[in-house]
Amino acid sequence: MRHSFSQAARSALALGLFAAGLGLSGAAMAQEPLIFVHGYSGSSSNFDAMVMRFTASGYPRSKLYGFNYNSLMSSDRTSASSLNSFINSVRASNGNQPVSVIAHSNGGLVVRWQRAKLGGEAGMRRFITLGTPHKGTTSAYGCYSPACFDMRPGSSFITQLAGAGCDRSLWSANDGVILPARNAQCGTNVQTASVGHIALLTDTSVYNQVRAQLP
């Protein structure tokens, strides 16, 4: 259940963040566990930049968790079941505190299923998606795997969700992967700077918007 954010990236980014004067400005943030859920064909190391910004702002490193799942082979339903077990384990290790979850791309669909179909909403204080194909993306017609089928507009997975399980969605008009871009909107929508799909993970202004959405 341990984190798998890359040590090299953490060290390098930390130096840059402190040089930029970010310091420990976020000490007043809630100290609940944060769980990061990657997108299709990704890994928790995709969140290295964001994790370092959290730790540089004073968030305890011990409260940051990365969830990995086999997005190339597993359906989003299967991944949601694994996520449910992971979240229960994290909560048990933290006095049964509620968690907040930050998910990128397809990871947001995995979390929504866990919230809407597996009872996960009760143990989650905040859920933030970054470029998630809530209503599907036409780019998913270019790949062939269970998760790709789930991400297609009008899929049985998206139809069964029927808009449930959303909370806060951050989306970019220049995403380039979620097509059309408005399909990344669900729940309370927050438009980011016009950055690409991957840059949602590393852009400083997007990180600041994520922080602003946390309770």
Language-model features, listed with the residues they occupy:
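Boundary at the C-terminal end of the N-terminal hydrophobic targeting segment
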Residues: 28-30
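Residues at alpha-helix caps and immediate loop-helix transition turns in enzyme cores, especially N-
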Residues: 46-47, 78-79, 202, 206
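C-terminal catalytic-base region of ester-bond hydrolases, centering on the histidine
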Residues: 148-215
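Serine-dependent carboxylesterase/thioesterase catalytic core
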Residues: 32-38, 45, 58-61, 66-67, ...
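Bacterial N-terminal signal peptides that target proteins for export
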Residues: 2-15
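A short, Lys/Arg-enriched amphipathic alpha-helix followed by its capping loop at the start of a domain
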Residues: 50-59
